[in-house]
Regions:
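Conserved N-terminal Rossmann-fold NAD(P)-binding element of oxidoreductases
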Residues: 4-9
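Hydrophobic/small residue at the entry helix of a nucleotide-binding pocket
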Residues: 12
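Helix N-cap at the beta1-alpha1 junction of Rossmann-like dinucleotide-binding domains, i.e.
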Residues: 36-40, 104
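Rossmann-fold cofactor-recognition segment
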Residues: 47-60
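Conserved Rossmann-fold cofactor-binding substructure of NAD(P)-dependent oxidoreductases
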Residues: 58-70
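ADP-ribose/adenylate-binding Rossmann-like module
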Residues: 89-107
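Rossmann-fold NAD(P)-binding glycine/threonine-rich loop
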Residues: 101-123
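C-terminal catalytic/substrate-binding lobe primarily of soluble NAD(P)-dependent oxidoreductases
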Residues: 145-289
Length: 289
């Protein structure tokens, strides 16, 4: 059997784990799920003949290396900043690796080493980034195959809740790492091309500069710019495009409300507020007023 190691058993990994477990018998896969919480790892594997859950501390070099060495493919569902040590282990032991995260400079720097060993390091293969890339290229290739020319490209994606579960004022729920939601949009200005002109939106204005779209059967949504769209211009083969824009979808009103947190400085994680875990929401907000 082929051995797949999944590191991280949090919210983002749930669907992946269930999918691979369902496929494990037919595809002859043995799934090892490693997490700092043994309970989290084993909640999927108890009683399953083709899976096991283990306690795996990614900061423990011996534990991490042993788990990687005993696998054929490693899927890291860790926060993006922790992928790099796993990637180095995969190169050391000659293992393929998959993540759902954007390619960091540190990960890109390992490209030649991975290629030299004949390894596949596949990143940006989740929902966003991931499915958006694949659906984009499917549409672009279809247009080109028919002799069409791309003048404008806009791609919208977002982790939205099902209408029947939409029962709070934010019209939003955490389905992935909450920290990543809080930090969304940070790390540099959003960059894109609009009608032949380069545009930049700094973080402090990101959630105030939105546009609206209508999705048939589901209603009106808003979109804010998603990171640096320009880096995909050559990857998508859109060198002569007049508009290139990738956006994140939210329900109408989300961005305006979230912008209040941004302007108050509540999304800044560069400092720690002592005893904040024991404060009421009112007390915490009052710190910034």
């Amino acid at each position: 059997m082929r051995n797949i190691l999944i590191i991280g058993a949090g919210r983002s990994a749930t669907s992946l784990i269930r999918y691979l477990l369902d496929k494990s018998e037919k595809e002859e896969l043995f799934i090892t799920i490693g997490d700092i919480s043994i309970q989290a790892a084993q909640r999927f594997t108890t009683g399953h003949p083709n899976a096991r859950g283990i306690m795996l501390d990614v900061f423990n070099d011996v534990q991490r290396k042993e788990a990687v060495e005993n696998s054929d493919l490693v899927i890291s569902m860790l926060p993006a900043r922790y992928h790099i040590e796993v990637a180095k282990d995969c190169i050391e032991f000659g293992k393929h690796m998959v993540t759902a995260s954007y390619i960091s400079k540190e990960m890109q720097a390992l490209n030649h080493k991975a290629q030299a060993k004949g390894l596949v390091f596949m990143n940006e293969i989740g929902l966003d980034p991931g499915i958006d890339h694949m659906s984009a290229m499917q549409v672009i290739d279809r247009i080109r195959a028919k002799g069409g020319k791309m003048l404008l490209f806009e791609s919208f994606c977002g982790g939205l809740i099902a209408p029947e579960s939409d029962n709070n004022l934010w019209n939003y729920k955490f389905t992935w790492n909450p920290r990543n939601v809080v930090l969304a949009g940070q790390g540099g200005a959003a960059e894109f091309i609009q009608e032949g002109k380069y545009k930049y939106i700094p973080y402090h204005r990101l959630f105030r500069r939105t546009e609206f779209i209508n999705i048939e059967g589901y209603g009106k949504f808003e979109v804010y710019a998603n990171r640096n769209s320009l880096q995909y211009q050559s990857i998508y083969g859109l060198e002569n495009i007049l508009t290139l824009y990738r956006g994140t979808i939210r329900r109408v009103g989300f961005s305006r409300a979230w912008n209040m947190f941004v302007q108050l400085g509540m999304t800044d994680d560069s400092y720690t507020i002592p005893d904040s875990e024991n404060m009421s929401y009112r007390e915490f907000v009052n710190l910034f007023l």
